[in-house]
Regions:
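Alpha-helical assembly-interface signal, strongest on the long, hydrophobic N-terminal helix that forms
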Residues: 2-104
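Short, conserved structural patches
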Residues: 63, 67, 71-189
Length: 189
C-alpha cells in the first residue's frame, strides 16, 4: 500500500504539485471559516442593536404605564369625592389583575407608533434593522433585530438572508402584570 506512495515521493516536483493542488482546498476552508466569523460579528451587531432598542422601549413604556396609572388613579379619586367614600386608588389598581392587564394593553396599543419609531431609531443607529418587539416575555421587553448576511463564499445561496439577534430590557414590575399570557407582538413589516 505504501510502496506506491514511496515511489510517488521519489519523483522531483511532486511536493510542489501537491501544494498547488491543495491551495484551492485551503482557500475554500479559510473562506468558510471567514464566513463563520462574519456570522459571529453580524450576530454581535444584531444583539447590541436589539439591546439598545429594548432599553429605549422600556424607557418609553415606563412613561406610558405611569401616565395610564395616573389617569386611572385620578379618576378613582374623583369618584371618591363624588360618592363621599374612600377607596385607595393604588390598592384598587394593583389588586385588580384585569385592570393591570388593561393598563398594559392600552399603553402598548395607544402608543404603538411612538414605540416603533423609538425602537427603529435606536436599532438603526446601532447598525441593524428592527424585526419584532415582544412585550413582556419574562417580564421584559424583548426586541429582535436583524443584519443582512454577506458571506465570503456562496453569496448567491445566501441572498436575502439575515442574522438575527435578541435583546432584553430590564425587568419591570408592570411586566409581570402580563404573566401567564402570550407576549404582545409588534412586527415592523
Amino acid at each position: 500500500m505504501f510502496r506506491g506512495l514511496r515511489k510517488f515521493n521519489r519523483k522531483r516536483g511532486n511536493v510542489t504539485l501537491m501544494w498547488v493542488v491543495a491551495l484551492p482546498v485551503f482557500m475554500i476552508i479559510f473562506m468558510f471559516l471567514g464566513s463563520l466569523v462574519v456570522v459571529w460579528m453580524d450576530h454581535a451587531i444584531a444583539e447590541k442593536a436589539a439591546d439598545a432598542g429594548s432599553l429605549a422601549a422600556t424607557k418609553k413604556m415606563d412613561g406610558y404605564v405611569s401616565a395610564e396609572l395616573q389617569t386611572i388613579m385620578s379618576r378613582i379619586l374623583q369618584e371618591n369625592a363624588e360618592n363621599q367614600t374612600f377607596v385607595d386608588p393604588y390598592q384598587y389598581v394593583l389588586g385588580n389583575s384585569g385592570l393591570k392587564r388593561g393598563i398594559i394593553k392600552s399603553a402598548v396599543r395607544n402608543n404603538e407608533e411612538e414605540l416603533i419609531k423609538e425602537v427603529r431609531k435606536y436599532v438603526e443607529q446601532n447598525g441593524a434593522e428592527p424585526s419584532k418587539i415582544y412585550f413582556f416575555a419574562d417580564g421584559r421587553i424583548q426586541v429582535e433585530a436583524k443584519v443582512k448576511f454577506t458571506p465570503l463564499i456562496w453569496a448567491e445561496e445566501f441572498a436575502n438572508k439575515y442574522v438575527k439577534g435578541k435583546g432584553f430590557g430590564p425587568t419591570r414590575d408592570y411586566g409581570s402584570w402580563w404573566s401567564n399570557r402570550k407576549p404582545l407582538e409588534v412586527s415592523f413589516e
